[in-house]
């Protein structure tokens, strides 16, 4: 029997027990001949309201149709009056009633239920036992649904190690809302929250207190609110680093490059990924610039400060670019130090424009001679401007030349 059925039966038993002592022989006779109104039956006993819903059936077993009423008693009046006195039982208190309700055993998964009860059961759809995509869980997870509405790209999140499992364990209201409010306080705009969390979903699993401590550390190092916003936006993983690690990174770049505190701060504001990336590539590139390329320490310092991206660039690409600029084009170290942005340019663009200038007889990079062309003019200008102002040729001539090489 289902739990609710047992509770109904127990309720009926309690109600019957509450009024069982109110029956008398005279009351039974009245029930046999005709049911008296229930309020009149209970008026002399001042019963609690919860006893009022008792059927007369509890007072006497039902008789068959047409059965005659019991004959009147021939006992003396005194005896009949004595018998008519109702026999009462102790009242069932509300506490006792609650105890009886508490005694109802809990439901069991093995308990048999009727077909009518079974068809009323609505089971939630099962989660996929395993899946390679978060898309299969979106309809089952309120957290994933709200993140999608926020602009998070789950197809990118699931490519990050254990990021999908993390999101499935989080509650949006309890775990995620407070992180979103924190990011807004840092300065991340509403329309940037989705892309930010797509790049760094792991921040949703961080303790709020730890995140606030890291922001407080940056402020203690004299980083302004706008600067912190810029750094966090450009390097989404920045706030995953502990205070100790952030402090070690700042100290590393200050000491390795020989920069002042102000210049070190300016360096990481412009390129905050220096604080979140690996240090080994940085050390190797510094070694390449000094040992292989032959730059002096102060020149390396200037190059790194002007173009910090060089510190994390591919060593192979750096070697190829330097070899072409220095050994083929004849650009000296001091000019490369003055305009290190040339190392960020594509080598193919440098080659195409240099060869076109040679074809025109205008490849002149010495600032002490006429018709000097700076490295900035060589690589930074759009093709049309480069052709008309630097090469003194048309765009069609440049395109025809490119087809010959």
UniProtKB/Swiss-Prot annotation:
Q: Which GO terms describe its molecular function?
A: transcription cis-regulatory region binding
Q: Which UniProt keywords apply?
A: Mitochondrion, Transcription, Transcription regulation, Transit peptide
Localization = Mitochondrion
Q: Which SMART domains match?
A: Mterf
Q: What InterPro entries does this protein's entry cite?
A: MTERF, MTERF_sf
Indicate yes or no for the key word Transcription.
Answer: yes
One of this protein's GO BP terms? mitochondrial ribosome assembly
Q: Which GO terms describe its cellular component?
A: mitochondrion
Here the transit peptide covers 1-64
Tell me where on the tree of life, at the top rank, the source sits: Eukaryota
Q: Does the keyword Transit peptide belong to this entry? A: yes
* Family the entry assigns: Belongs to the mTERF family.
What the protein does comes down to:
Binds promoter DNA and regulates initiation of transcription. Required for normal mitochondrial transcription, and for normal assembly of mitochondrial respiratory complexes. Required for normal mitochondrial function.
Q: What is known of its domains?
A: Contains about seven structural repeats of about 35 residues, where each repeat contains three helices. The repeats form a superhelical structure with a solenoid shape.
Q: What is the protein's name according to its record? A: Transcription termination factor 3, mitochondrial
UniProt organism field: Gallus gallus
UniProt lineage: Eukaryota, Metazoa, Chordata, Craniata, Vertebrata
């Amino acid at each position: 029997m289902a739990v609710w059925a047992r509770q109904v039966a127990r309720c009926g038993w309690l109600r019957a027990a509450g009024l069982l002592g109110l029956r008398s022989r005279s009351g039974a006779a009245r029930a046999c001949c005709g049911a008296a109104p229930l309020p009149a039956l209970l008026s002399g006993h001042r019963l609690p309201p919860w006893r009022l819903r008792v059927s007369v059936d509890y007072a006497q077993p039902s008789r068959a149709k047409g059965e005659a009423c019991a004959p009147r008693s021939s006992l003396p009046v005194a005896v009949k009056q004595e018998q008519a006195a109702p026999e009462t039982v102790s009242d069932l208190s509300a506490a006792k009633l609650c105890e009886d309700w508490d005694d109802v055993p809990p439901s069991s998964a093995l308990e048999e239920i009727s077909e009518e009860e079974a068809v009323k059961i609505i089971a939630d759809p099962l989660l996929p036992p395993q899946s390679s995509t978060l898309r299969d869980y979106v309809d089952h997870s309120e957290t994933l649904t709200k993140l999608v509405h926020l602009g998070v790209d789950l197809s990118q999140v699931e490519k990050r190690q254990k990021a999908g499992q993390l999101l499935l364990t989080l509650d949006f209201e309890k775990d995620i809302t407070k992180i979103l409010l924190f990011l807004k306080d840092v300065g991340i705009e509403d329309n940037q929250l989705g892309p930010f969390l797509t790049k760094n979903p792991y921040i949703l699993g961080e303790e709020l207190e730890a995140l606030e401590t890291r922001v407080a550390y940056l402020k203690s190092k004299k980083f302004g609110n706008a600067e912190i916003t810029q750094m966090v936006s450009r390097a989404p993983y920045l706030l995953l680093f502990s205070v100790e690690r952030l402090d070690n990174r700042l100290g590393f770049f200050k000491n390795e490059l020989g920069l002042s505190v102000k210049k070190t701060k300016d360096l990481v504001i412009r390129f905050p990924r220096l604080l979140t990336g690996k240090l080994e590539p940085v050390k190797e590139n510094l070694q390449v610039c000094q040992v292989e390329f032959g730059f002096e320490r102060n020149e390396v310092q200037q190059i790194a400060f002007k173009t910090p991206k060089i510190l994390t660039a591919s060593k192979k690409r750096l070697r190829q670019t330097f070899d072409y600029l220095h050994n083929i084009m004849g650009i000296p170290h001091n000019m490369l130090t003055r305009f290190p942005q040339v190392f960020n340019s594509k080598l193919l663009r440098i080659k195409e424009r240099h060869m076109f200038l040679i074809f025109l007889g205008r490849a002149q990079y010495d600032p002490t001679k006429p018709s000097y062309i700076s490295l900035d003019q060589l690589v930074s200008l759009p093709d049309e401007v480069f052709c008309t102002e630097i090469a003194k040729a048309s765009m069609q001539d440049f395109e025809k030349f490119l087809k010959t090489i």
